[in-house]
Swiss-Prot record:
HAMAP family: PSII_PsbA_D1
Coiled-coil residue spans: none
Gene: psbA
Presence of keyword Metal-binding: yes
Entry-annotated residues carrying N-acetylthreonine: 2
Sequence positions that bind [CaMn4O5] cluster: 170, 189, 332-333, 342, 344
Keyword check for Isomerase: no
Binding, chlorophyll a ChlzD1: 118
Binding site for Fe cation: 215, 272
Bilayer-spanning residue ranges: 29-46, 118-133, 142-156, 197-218, 274-288
Protein name: Photosystem II protein D1
UniProt xrefs under PROSITE patterns: REACTION_CENTER
PTM (free text): Tyr-161 forms a radical intermediate that is referred to as redox-active TyrZ, YZ or Y-Z. C-terminally processed by CTPA; processing is essential to allow assembly of the oxygen-evolving complex and thus photosynthetic growth.
Amino acid sequence: MTAILERRESESLWGRFCNWITSTENRLYIGWFGVLMIPTLLTATSVFIIAFIAAPPVDIDGIREPVSGSLLYGNNIISGAIIPTSAAIGLHFYPIWEAASVDEWLYNGGPYELIVLHFLLGVACYMGREWELSFRLGMRPWIAVAYSAPVAAATAVFLIYPIGQGSFSDGMPLGISGTFNFMIVFQAEHNILMHPFHMLGVAGVFGGSLFSAMHGSLVTSSLIRETTENESANEGYRFGQEEETYNIVAAHGYFGRLIFQYASFNNSRSLHFFLAAWPVVGIWFTALGISTMAFNLNGFNFNQSVVDSQGRVINTWADIINRANLGMEVMHERNAHNFPLDLAVVEAPSTNG
């Protein structure tokens, strides 16, 4: 008997790289989306940390009045932020090599644009990586779909809104107090609290929290006892066990009697789909609302909508909100504008020389 041995050609370096990138045996899955995600998120994170600690003040309004945002320039964790790119730059792409010097780049808020653009690319790739890993493992794609909600929200406040307003200086600052300032100014200029898409987002976030707490407490309260009184109930579960760890019939019966029968899910799959879909759809709507208000399609205006028989205005809560909006608007960027936009719409009378 003759044995024929064929020499296998060694796999190319590129082939081995492809197999390693797409292998689901790695401790952390990389994937083709990860090839772009890793450097972009590392860049965004590194520049954020450095700028939050040491970036010099930024001329955010383009009027030669720099605003300090870093720790070394007098801020703390609460007040510190990455200050948005200057209004003098607008929507221009502003990498370091477009500035005359690094000092000019820092003064005009170049780090903000660098961080935001790398961050958005990175989180979009993270979403793609979630889909890619699900595909490799034969799973359904809904993890990436759910993650699209926060991606859409981040894209709305960091990219779509600045595009609509004409400048990255209108983007959300990267800090705690800066986020609150963004929210207050957004309310003043766009009346977001009266926008139905924001209302749907509030229902999504608060409702999702409520449903998550209800589900977790129901499951925890209907665990199948596997331990003694002296042991933690958590010891009664073994990872990968086939049998159910809680009694869904008991949970269904409890909740059906607490509210009414049809308020309780009797299908675990439809229940968990609902738990995922409710907050995701709500945040989708909020992101869509931000994106429409970016182009000044604002919240409802019910100002002075109720009058008496003499034509006198009877104030409603809408008028109270409007008064607060005007107060917030006149206080922000107070050195950049003589009047808020709402008070400057009337043309000045022409004078004949």
